[in-house]
Design a protein with these regions (language model features):
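Ribosome-associated RNA-binding proteins
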Residues: 1-301
């Protein structure tokens, strides 16, 4: 059953579909990651609340994508992607110091990152038990670490929105860096990927292939990996709202940047209104002068 159309009960008085529940689960994972990365030992309650609030406001935190949820009746499968912005920022600072020969620059600490801590079996089990109390059924939880925010539209929109909340950042520079810093294939590489998919011959299976010796070739995961979208080819970021620093004028701005091959080519329509090879992500934020919205579109080949 597709997760877009599945439905379940939070309780017997309140029925919600799974897309609505995905937002709740996303906030649950984000809150769990925030609390686990705050030191609460021998600290007063007021200091703990202040530390958690500061952790939520920082840009170098763990970002969680909107979970992909499937309801199989007896169990629920939840898949979410994680991105560690603190680890990426430390790596970028180390590369910049090495490039300019600054030996006195602080080096990234060698140890466990925020995401690796969450991927431990002990922490995953605790998080899964919390979800099982919500769903009232077994939960199959899968957390996947991403190396770049441009690999998921939800994470990229959240990163851009968090950076725009800081008044020291220029909106145009934030949106430009989110698009042009993405490592994307050129037009020739995209053409080769599409051509290779078109030339791929359909596989025909025999009854002898569905044996224990050939399980690796005929299981559902291997087949889905062959037909799935292989690579991000374009990134588009758009921001609209109160992005200016002026307080006297009730003025709205719109900034947009795009990078990579075009994603306007013909593609199969998903759910009647959306292209299957384009992933969209939306986020919003608030500055001192008002609110703004972020829209991200990732094209795939």
């Amino acid at each position: 059953m597709e997760w877009q159309t599945s439905a379940y009960y939070w309780n017997k008085h309140n029925e919600k579909n799974l897309p609505v529940a995905a937002t709740t689960v996303q906030k649950l994972i984000e809150g769990y990651a925030t609390v686990r990365n705050v030191n609460i030992q021998n600290r007063p309650q007021r200091a703990i609340r202040a530390a958690i609030a500061a952790r939520r406001r920082t840009a170098e935190k763990v970002y969680v994508s909107k979970p992909r949820i499937k309801d199989f009746g007896k169990k629920v499968q939840v898949t979410a992607f994680l991105y560690d912005a603190k680890e990426a920022a430390a790596s970028a600072r180390a590369k910049q110091a090495e490039r300019f020969g600054n030996k006195s620059a602080p080096q990234p600490k060698q140890g466990q990152s925020q995401v690796e801590f969450l991927l431990e079996e002990e922490q995953t089990t605790k998080l899964r038990r919390i979800m099982e109390q919500v769903y009232k059924r077994p939960v199959d939880l899968k957390l996947i670490k991403l190396s770049k925010p441009q690999l998921d539209a939800d994470i990229l929109s959240a990163v851009v929105a968090q950076q725009l909340k800081d008044r020291r950042n220029t909106p145009r520079r934030v949106i430009r860096d989110a698009t042009w810093r993405a490592a994307l294939p050129n037009a020739q590489a995209v053409s080769n990927i599409i051509q290779a998919k078109h030339e791929r011959q359909p596989e025909r299976f025999k009854w002898n292939d569905f044996t224990l010796a050939n399980t690796s070739q005929t299981n559902s995961s291997t087949i889905l990996d062959k037909v799935a979208l292989s690579q991000v080819t374009s990134v588009g970021v758009e921001a609209a709202g109160r992005l200016t620093k002026r307080l006297t004028a009730n003025r709205s701005q719109r900034k947009m940047a795009r990078h990579g091959a075009t994603a306007k080519e013909a593609g199969p329509i998903l759910r009647g209104f959306q292209k299957a090879h384009v992933q969209h992500g939306f986020s919003r934020g608030k500055r001192r002068v008002g609110q703004f919205g972020i829209r991200v579109a990732l094209g795939h080949a």
